[in-house]
Swiss-Prot record:
Keywords: Host membrane, Membrane, Transmembrane, Transmembrane helix. The chain crosses the membrane at residues 51-71. It comes from Snake adenovirus serotype 1 (SnAdV-1). The lineage of its organism: Viruses, Varidnaviria, Bamfordvirae, Preplasmiviricota, Tectiliviricetes. This is Protein ORF1. Its main location: host cell.
Amino acid sequence: MEGTDWSGWGDDSDFPWPKGSRVTFPSYQLEDPPYAAPSDLDLVGKGHLHIAFVILIVSLFVLLLGVLLACHFLRRSLSPISVSSRCSPCRLFYDRCRPYTSLEKGVELSCV
């Protein structure tokens, strides 16, 4: 920074101790005591981990709900011509594919 007047900053008249003296601290004060509070970085990391876990659980729930709704609507919208395609989407989640007897066609599967 050119043009800045630094006179009066940091001269020895600001400090009451003699010139050349040093302040020393005992070694135990330089370390964190065992009862010290966790640092802010530790708390932020745990908070982010908790938020990520909640987002994961909610997204898995939404995914499961989407699969169940898709199965529900696919089950209703598929044509009754093909028996195997009618029951394949809902067989995994629903136990609604049950046999019924017909005099003309014999035993078939029906998704109700």
